[in-house]
Amino acid sequence: MKALKIALTKGRLEKDAVALLEKAGIDCSSMTDKKRKLIFHSSTQPISFILVKAVDVMTYVKHGVADIGIVGKDVLMEASKSHYEMLDLEIGKCQFCLASTPDFDPSSYRRKIIATKYPTVASKFFREKGEDVEIIKIEGSVEIAPVLGLADAIIDIVETGSTLKENGLLIYEKMYPISARLIVNKASLKQNKTQIFQLIDQLEQVIKEERAE
């Protein structure tokens, strides 16, 4: 039986994903002592894991290097769809928010400048509102953009809001909820249908049980 390759997002989401996979009966013990390794093979099941950055999960899945990926909905919303989004894992929950300084007027008719790491999401949001805005893409700490006068407001993902508060920003609108999703390579789904759907069924059962608690 061909080993399923699962691409995981490094960092906090990785820990939540591994915990969920283990509850679903997936052997993740090979990842216990990671050190600097990025590829792991289960010794008891035909499964291996790849640890990569969030945006690279989609790349590995798209090109079939990974059969399955676990990645945040924020990454999926920003990229072109070249995969099947199979399951909301209900972990890594946060939301897209519009935030700015206390003197920001969201109802102003003046053309706004919006700083964000997610220009596609920002464009969609303001297009749906019928607003024409200028969008500046920032890769780093987007929170300082309105404080320094680079932008009128920002669009970013928010979990607790503590980083916004520390930088003197307020949330003006909660936009889209986000959570981790399980995505599958289109060719892999055809070739490994039984294995993949078995994994999905196991995960769905765990999610259902946790939701009922």
Swiss-Prot record:
| UniProt keyword annotations, A-Z | Amino-acid biosynthesis, ATP-binding, Cytoplasm, Glycosyltransferase, Histidine biosynthesis, Nucleotide-binding, Transferase
Q: In which pathway does it act?
A: Amino-acid biosynthesis; L-histidine biosynthesis; L-histidine from 5-phospho-alpha-D-ribose 1-diphosphate: step 1/9
Q: Which domain of life is it from?
A: Bacteria
Disulphide bridges in this chain? none
Reactions listed under catalytic activity: 1-(5-phospho-beta-D-ribosyl)-ATP + diphosphate = 5-phospho-alpha-D-ribose 1-diphosphate + ATP
Pfam hit, one: HisG
Q: What is its EC number?
A: 2.4.2.17
Q: Which compartments does it reside in?
A: Cytoplasm
Q: Name one GO cellular component term.
A: cytoplasm
Record flagged with keyword Lyase: no
Can you name one GO molecular function term for this protein? ATP phosphoribosyltransferase activity
Question: GO biological process annotations for this chain's record?
Answer: L-histidine biosynthetic process
- What PROSITE patterns does its record include? ATP_P_PHORIBOSYLTR
What function does the entry list?
A: Catalyzes the condensation of ATP and 5-phosphoribose 1-diphosphate to form N'-(5'-phosphoribosyl)-ATP (PR-ATP). Has a crucial role in the pathway because the rate of histidine biosynthesis seems to be controlled primarily by regulation of HisG enzymatic activity.
Q: How does it assemble?
A: Heteromultimer composed of HisG and HisZ subunits.
Cite the domain annotation text.
Lacks the C-terminal regulatory region which is replaced by HisZ.
Q: Which family does it belong to?
A: Belongs to the ATP phosphoribosyltransferase family. Short subfamily.
Return the protein name.
ATP phosphoribosyltransferase
Species per Swiss-Prot/TrEMBL record:
Listeria monocytogenes serotype 4b (strain CLIP80459)
Q: What is the lineage of its organism?
A: Bacteria, Bacillati, Bacillota, Bacilli, Bacillales
